[in-house]
Amino acid sequence: MTVYNINLGIGWASSGVEYAQAYRAQILRRIQQPAKFIFMDMILADNIQHLTENIGFLDEEIIWLYNYFTDIKIAPTTVTLDQVLAQVAGQPERSEKEGKIVRYFYPQDDQFITCYLRQEDQDSVEHVEYVSRGRLIRKDYFSYVRYASEYFAPHNDAATLYQRRFYHEDGSVAYDMLIEDGQEKLYRFPDRIFYSKAELVRYFLQCLQLQADDVVILDRETGIGQVVFEESQKAKLGVVVHAEHFSENASSDDYILWNNFYDYQFTNADKVDFFIVATEAQKRILEQQFQHYSDKQPQIATIPVGSLDQLTYPKEPRKPYSMITASRLATEKHIDWLVAATVQAHAQLPELTLDIYGKGSEEDKLRRRIEEAGAQDYIRLKGHADLSQIYAGYELYLTASTSEGFGLTLMEAVGSGLPLIGFDVRYGNQTFIDDGKNGYLLPVSSNHVEDQIIAAFVEKIIALFSQGRQQEMSQHSYQVAENYLTSRVEAAWTQLLKEVRDDSAL
């Protein structure tokens, strides 16, 4: 029995879906359940191994769709500059280095190559661009060997990608992919041709040779849902619901508008062996909705998408008046509201600090806001970090997200005994924040009046630090966190997979 977990992409600023999968990988390892994590997107900006290792996957757990048809293993980049140069005819006349970019010039051939290093202080090359007569003609991608190339031709005075090639370890061609208008149009193998990605995905799933006791867990389905459903029927199919699954405002007693990311799965729920949600509240709502709006009654299991190996206690006293938030720095996380609230609250609590962990598209904008407020001394952007031992140094966790399917950072925060302040929204905040006991739930309205929101945060921040209840609230957070200890989540996964195995044996 193997558990195959299907996702689309992964990046350095991964979403909660990828972190949920990484937690799941740890749990499945601990209960000795063989598992694979499959990524279906084209990922060439970075070696996928660097991205998956970064959040805790093991190389042998990873299947990348486009690499699957080769004999090249998922592995870190180790090809060196010297190895790259050895494959280029002639000797470079000069070179330039700036950060992680090294450029070699061959004026006798009117060409240069640009090497992109994995790290500035190393000579491992992730990919190389070849420019001839001022035009980009090829890119090569490396791990421990070259695993892919992209070919370009001039079109409308711009380099246009027209072909990708994937290799075996010995350098022979595994297959070619033809590109038209930036879209994958054709996949040419030595013994077959596919004319769409759907056909390629179907062939891939058939190559897995799924058995009755295998389990396919679909984490994201955009563009692949129908094929996965059809090819997984010989195994057991599970679907994980990672977010709010319906639009409350657009639903009525006669009609429900499912979240478009789950519409296909819910519409075809009779083909699903089980759904997984992260909270009991979401399970209750989804069960009621299936009863009310459909004739399908699928199995729904509640399994937290993360877990805590143990509760974490501070090794030294927490820093007074210290606050932390952690998330992707994206617009929907509304970190700007937390910055504004901290600036206002700081006027009354001059020792107040806020550390912001995470990376994302809003980072530069947030940095400017902090600088414009003159708040650099007490609001800091901390980037990515392993937060497991960091939370316990703070006194309060803030979240301004208006929708959180579970909230891994909320779980981690209560596991380190932090009180929390966030909106009274399903499901994560209402699960981890017991209003008035380990923090505060703030009212939220659909129109998001910014001044009112910021004022509400300011009021509760000042209240929490002024009432002297931090220790009492901290203890209540630890009590909430006990429900998410790894031992309990392991038991939930063991039970679900046992039920699946028993059912497949019938």
From Swiss-Prot:
It is found in: Cytoplasm; Cell membrane. It comes from the Bacteria. Residues 307-506 are annotated as: R-fold-2. One of its GO terms (molecular function) is glycosyltransferase activity. Residues 196-306 are annotated as: C-terminus R-fold-1. N-acetyl-D-glucosamine binds at residues 242, 405-407. It is an enzyme of class 2 (transferase). GO terms for cellular component: cytoplasm; plasma membrane; protein N-acetylglucosaminyltransferase complex. It catalyses: L-seryl-[protein] + UDP-N-acetyl-alpha-D-glucosamine = 3-O-[N-acetyl-alpha-D-glucosaminyl]-L-seryl-[protein] + UDP + H(+). Its EC number is 2.4.1.-. Gene3D superfamilies: Glycogen Phosphorylase B. It is a peripheral membrane protein. Pathway: Protein modification; protein glycosylation. Residues 1-78 are annotated as: N-terminus R-fold-1. It holds the Pfam family GtfA_EBD. Keywords: Cell membrane, Cytoplasm, Glycosyltransferase, Membrane, Nucleotide-binding, Transferase. Residues 79-195 are annotated as: Extended beta-sheet domain. Has 2 Rossmann-like domains, called R-fold-1 and R-fold-2. R-fold-1 is interrupted by an extended beta-sheet domain that loops out of the structure. UDP and N-acetyl-D-glucosamine bind between the Rossman-like folds, which move closer together upon binding. Belongs to the glycosyltransferase group 1 family. Glycosyltransferase 4 subfamily. This is UDP-N-acetylglucosamine--peptide N-acetylglucosaminyltransferase GtfA subunit. It comes from Streptococcus gordonii. The gene is gtfA.
